[in-house]
Amino acid sequence: MNTRFSNVYDDHARSEAYATLEFPGTYYLAFRDLPAIIGEHVHGRKAVDFGCGAGRSTQFLRELGFEVVGVDISEPMLARARARDPQGDYRLVPDGELGSLAANAYDLALSAFTFDNIPTMEKKVTLLQGLKRLLTAGGQIVNLVSSPEIYVNEWASFSTRDFPENRAARCGDKVLIVMLDVEDRRPVEDILWTDEGYREVYERAGVRPIRTYRPLGNPGEPYSWVSEAGLAPWVIYVLGRAE
């Protein structure tokens, strides 16, 4: 089995579409609560953005006051990040290899949606161990991932109605979803991963969940929620060293 960490956004057309996306609709819920979550759990100002893509989350962290390095496996996405943010620090990490970054140097490692595309338990564990190596003694990992519910419901920014096979998917299976906020409507292929599966990954990687958040849409927000008011499309794990 090929277990290399690949990225659908190496595709030129898809990376072009994704690079124009900000934080609308369902994506708003992924980032709405992060300032408060990070403020509660993270002490220090150095951060690494793992899977930074076009750099939106990297700039988000900088706006929160962090000195941040954005890393990604996709050169096309990094090129867009550098074009959008010429002053940013963006680095290529082939296959997610983080050995070029200093150990024990970062107070926060943010991973926003990256683990949705990592194919196996072993690869997830290895990458989390790599992120753990980067942390200061009191550093935290914030792992933002798609909930299993996102692949079997309709959302302001996503559709899964054309993929009934998603309902039979188990932890580690491929699932399909369409992004509605970009011109490129080809299905995105993700890897379904359950809460139970993530907790096993964390135990094997030597990190422990400190808090888990499942953000819901609220009345009065500037979006027409579909499932978001009752079902969380995202799960946000705050992780620390297990020692």
PLM regions and their residue ranges:
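C-terminal lobe and adjacent flexible extensions of AdoMet/dcAdoMet transferase-like proteins
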Residues: 205-243
